[in-house]
Amino acid sequence: MTRPSRLRSLLHRSALLLAACASLAPAAHAAKPLLTFKVDDTVTARVERADREHITVRFLPSGKTQTLDVIAADEEGHYHLSSDDYNFDGHRDLAMHATLGMVNDSYGIYLYDPTRQQFEPLHLPASDMPHGNCDDLVNVVAKPKERTLYSSCRGGPIWYTDAYRFDASGKMYLYQSSEAIPDDLRDLLDADSGPSSMLLTYDAQGKRVSRRPDAYGGGAVTFKVRPARLPLHDAMNDAPTRRYVVAGDTVEVIDASADFQWLKVRYRNPHAGAVQGWVSAKEAMGN
């Protein structure tokens, strides 16, 4: 072979090699995983982008694949992926989340089903069951020691927190939520702290099992008595008893009527011990 022929052959082979590398590069880029995590000791999930509205999960070592909808994204279609054991069954699950507004990070969660060896969407409680203050799962935090999934969102000046648990069949139910206290009453109760609320607790069947005052950040709700004398009642709408608290006394709120017209309070008298009774919210506010 002459020297020019050898040169042409070398250039031809170089061109073919460059073309092959160029054709492989996009494929390699497309296969780059968005997230890889161990579901359990035997299964690894490799998450790849399928298109703008879908992702593909490849389970290793089986090689089985599953296509999932993108169920949480911002207005531009952006989202983040993370994994955690959101239902506390020993298997890590998959979450998509995106920031909507200034502080609310909206979540869409897929739970791993070890029997079917695939992910299934986590659903909020049915329409006939209690629902929380947040319309969806927001700013999600899983606390395995409590076996509770927390969702919190901001509405105006108030942060709301919904707590979810899972029943024996694995279905999620609302465990705790909060009920807002009227603004005029919060002025009395929240003089030295953030907004208090009523903490509502439910069982797995959706029955409310307790309702109690809860201070901002947790703890007892208290207020200082404003009127010179604030009479105590044995029951709402009963005539006042001979017992009363006086201006400057600090009392703890332990219950409230459904319309917040009456507050049940406890006062720890240094001489007579703890006394409790109902007071008129209107009288307590000095109105």
Where on the chain are the PLM-derived regions?
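Bacterial N-terminal signal peptides
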Residues: 13-25
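Terminal domain-start segments
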Residues: 30-79
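Calcium-coordinating acidic loop motifs
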Residues: 85-87, 114
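Acidic/hydrophobic-patterned starts of short beta strands in beta-sheet-rich repeat architectures
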Residues: 87-98, 146-151
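Structural motif
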Residues: 103-109, 158-163
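Short aromatic loop motif centered on NTY/YTY
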Residues: 118-215
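SH3-family beta-barrel domains
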Residues: 188-231, 238, 244-247, 254-259, ...
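SH3/SH3-like beta-barrel fold
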Residues: 248, 263-268
